[in-house]
């Protein structure tokens, strides 16, 4: 995803990498066991415990297809995602396109099946960090944000701020720090999750 943002010197993919690295770095502070980073087309980096290791993991540029269903299925079958584990799993999925299978064929129904029917929403919270303008992708991510329990979707900073101000008012304060907080806990805190959604009106 090479779409330019802001002053044109940055791309949405670079922004996504930056926010993902921030999320990982914060995660290493709050989880003494470290955080696990799974890539779709190369080996995982497990038990990352400091910012230097985060930087090393992102040296190689992304390549290949987007087999999200297979990757998610593998992760939610790990012991950390099982009911009864002493900690819940907060899963961040950073993506810039439509899910495919390992051969590159569109695979959205299978990914949706894993999210709805195989993921346990009580033990596995999912935070999507996306950078795409494809109408189909935007539509199904927005639907999942509204209908799936313990799931939140966050776009790049400028798009997210514009969406929030569309519903909350043009002067609604939303800084880069607020963006990082939403990216971190949107799938855990319903109030944060709802920031980029229409305000519900109670007719009572």
Tell what function each PLM region has:
Residues 1, 42-45, 96-100, 131-135, ...:
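Conserved beta-strand elements of beta-rich interaction domains across eukaryotes
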Residues 26-30, 76-87, 117-120:
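Surface-exposed acidic, glycine-flexible loop patches that form ligand/cofactor-binding
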Residues 98-154:
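VWA/integrin I-like adhesion module and closely mimicked acidic/polar interface patches used
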Residues 134-204:
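P/S/T/G-enriched low-complexity
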Residues 1-34:
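…and closely analogous acidic/polar surface helices at protein-protein or active-site interfaces
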Residues 45-47, 51-88, 99, 131-139:
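Von Willebrand factor
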Residues 13-20, 69-73, 104-115:
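Well-ordered, non-membrane alpha-helical segments in soluble/globular domains
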Residues 3-8, 38, 49-56, 104-107, ...:
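Short coil/turn segments at secondary-structure boundaries
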């Amino acid at each position: 995803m090479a779409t330019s943002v802001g002053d044109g010197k940055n791309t949405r993919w670079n922004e996504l990498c930056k926010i993902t690295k921030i999320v990982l770095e914060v995660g290493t502070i709050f989880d003494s066991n470290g955080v696990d980073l799974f890539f779709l087309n190369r080996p995982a980096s497990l038990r990352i415990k400091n910012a230097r290791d985060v930087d090393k993991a992102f040296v190689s540029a992304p390549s290949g297809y987007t087999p999200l269903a297979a990757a998610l299925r593998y992760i939610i079958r790990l012991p950390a995602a099982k009911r009864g584990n002493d900690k819940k799993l907060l899963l961040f999925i950073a993506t810039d396109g439509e899910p495919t299978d390992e051969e590159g064929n569109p695979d959205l129904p299978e990914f949706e099946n894993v999210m709805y029917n195989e993921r346990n929403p009580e033990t596995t919270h999912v935070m999507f960090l996306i950078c795409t303008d494809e109408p189909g992708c935007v539509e199904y991510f927005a639907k999942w944000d509204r209908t799936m329990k313990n799931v939140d979707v966050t776009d790049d900073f400028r798009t997210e701020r514009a969406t929030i101000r569309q519903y909350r008012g043009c002067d609604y304060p939303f800084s880069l720090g607020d963006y990082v907080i939403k990216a971190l806990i949107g799938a855990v805190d319903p109030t944060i999750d709802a920031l980029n959604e229409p305000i519900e009106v109670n007719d009572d």
